[in-house]
Amino acid sequence: MNYRKIVSAVALLWCTAGFAAGSEPAACVRPMMGTGAAGCVVPVAAAPFGMVQLGPDTYFTASGYHYDHPLIYGFSHTHKSGGGGTDYQDIMFFPVMDAVWTQQQVCPDRVGSRYSHEQEFIEPGYYRIRLDSDVDAELTATARCGMHRYTYPEGAMRQLIIDLKHGCEHSTTIFADEDFDTVKISRLEWVDDRTVRGYRVSNGWAPEQHVYFYAEFSEPIVSCRLFDHKHFRDGVRELEGTDVRAVLRFGGKAGKPVVVRVGISPVSMDGARQNLRAEIKGWNFDKVRKTTYRDWNEALSAVRIADADSPQKEVFYTSLYFAMLYPMLYSDVTGEYRSSDSKVYKGDFRYFAGVLGLWDTFRAQNPLIAILRPDVTRDLMKTLLEHYRHCGQLPIWTLAGVENMCMIGYHSMPLVADAYCKGIRGYDAEALYEAMKASANRDTFGYFLKAFRGTRYYKQYEYVPCDLEVTSVSKTLEYCYDDWCIAQMARMLGHRDDYDYYIGRAGWYKNLFDQNLNFMRGRNSDGSWRTPFDPFHSNHYRPDDDFCEGTSWQWTFFVPHDGKGLMNLFGGRDPFVAKLDSLFTVSSEIHGDNPAPDITGLIGQYAQGNEPGHHTLYMYNYAGQPWKGQKRISDVIYTLYDTSPEGICGNDDTGQMSAWYVMSSMGFYPVTHGRGVYFIGTPIFGEMSVKHPNGVLTIRANGVSRENCYIQSVTLNGAPYSKNWLRHEDLFGGNATLAFEMGPEPNKNWGSSPEDLPQSMCDETFEN
């Protein structure tokens, strides 16, 4: 029987059928978007929010794959697709046919296989490639398990390498930037002729990451040769060390595909076995693939777009797909998980979240998930509280459930305030509120790449002095915003004294604004300004770097909670708007010996490719000139996003770049968190519906096109609506209809009156 032809025919039928059903959201997803340039997207097989991201690894890339790299070195079970931190790529499998006798042959990360993108196919939950060895490799996944199907040429020796040494070569530890992904200990056991199990414990972007696996094979293993440190260890069935690999050879019917099902766990090998038993019960690869595809289609169907022929429809659903990879599950079916103290606990929730890239995701990705999947956000709130109980502070940036101190700020605060104001309950809100206050007042959080993290100097000086800490301006601005979010939580819970205190801290951003230059700039501990000053300057993590991954041009507008207060510093609306206009027209040149590589997607000095400015296009609403933002938002949507491998202008960053697109294309964006408010931008689809637990939001944009990007008028549930912002409860408290009339010229009257503007911190009180 020619198994290869049968499997290939089934795969071809799937490929054709999947993309023929163009009305289904999952059929619109183009997962190769962002796999080139700086997108750091990996074409993984994964379930929504799944722990397993099973996919190909190419040479020396941050996330594991780059479209331009010609070699595949294997298929690992863990990735962080979208970058924003370099790690994972654990438990790699690689099919081979020739006899393996040498160190060179047993190390696929030194050999690899060429491939062609013409032989590559991916859809939600499935990846397929024909390697130049003529082996067809197919991958699918459930939440906690991966499934492989390898079809070898007729008559070939069917072998598989398992590599526990392989990891992310660009992963540095949090302690020293010269140390790469290091295996602390790994183990592999040949249990019987159908089973292999083991684990890999490593230091990388986060310390002491535990990955356990339990693998079962459809074909009998007739030999399992173990390898450690340049030598085969013949005659042994288990091996422990830091350079462990195995070469498996299969018996059974010649030419028959080898199907592998693999459970993954952060807890134990038995946890991996239980995950496998719960999620994959047979050997039907196509059934698992179909089920995961169905799960993705159901998840993506939360948003339905009526525009049948819109080219942006594929970008939208791909972006929503990327956004719904996170927060990443990190608990077993038993509820057990490994926390930041490396101990195992059991939680009362379905999902313990193991990847929290909060510096990125607090802006739009987490608020988007709170709208579409409040159940996931509820478990995320429980995750935050569990993390606090085990390590004494709320997460800053976690990977594999472990804190790594990456980036700045304490951005659990916006997540909590956003979830609570949206009515998401089912967790101990008062305990979480106490955790917010404790976390925001720690003198020392820890260190990242030898750089200090903490609020000691911030509290002492009411700004972070540039002679005492790097990225001092960015830290100050983000601490102020996070403190504002704490104040919102205090207001909602009725804590007046706390509200007054944190509102006061939220105004400390004013201490770094130079009114002579109209820029935020670094200030020394003696109160003097850092000199010389260059608003185009970036010197990534060097001693004179006052701005995290950006310039003063980009960071001066990071006061999302107090637009009016910021305008007052500029001297009023007109100079503020003039400066904001200039942001998009000045030179895109970046000065400095080591400019931050993340400053990408530039329009003037506006950088769409990095997160600090994602709200900036909406700051025109504070000034009563929303039409200026409408045009620029439309330009970004149409020029900086497409479905090509280069279609994301920066790292997707745990889905934040994608979530910005999703929210913005709906016509509104969460500039602030904790007030339940969205700033109106510009919609791009004629009609879409958003399904949420309380009903359906219908969004219509009559006459919309790229040219017709200007709002002429708005109605909410049939009534005229002139405000340039919206309340969450009006959109998502039940069924609602938001309708736009669009045109080619701006209506400068709509959304421009003082009563139509969003509230700023300087005008808010405890009561309102």
Where are these regions (language model features)?
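Extracellular/periplasmic, surface-exposed regions of secreted and cell-surface proteins
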Residues: V690-H692
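ATP-dependent phospho-/nucleotidyl transfer catalytic cores
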Residues: D482
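Extracellular attachment/recognition segments
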Residues: Y710
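Bacterial N-terminal signal peptides
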Residues: S8-A17
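Bacterial N-terminal signal peptides that target proteins for export
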Residues: M1-S8
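Accessory carbohydrate-recognition regions in carbohydrate-active enzymes
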Residues: A21-N366, A370-P414, Y420-L477, C485-N511, ...
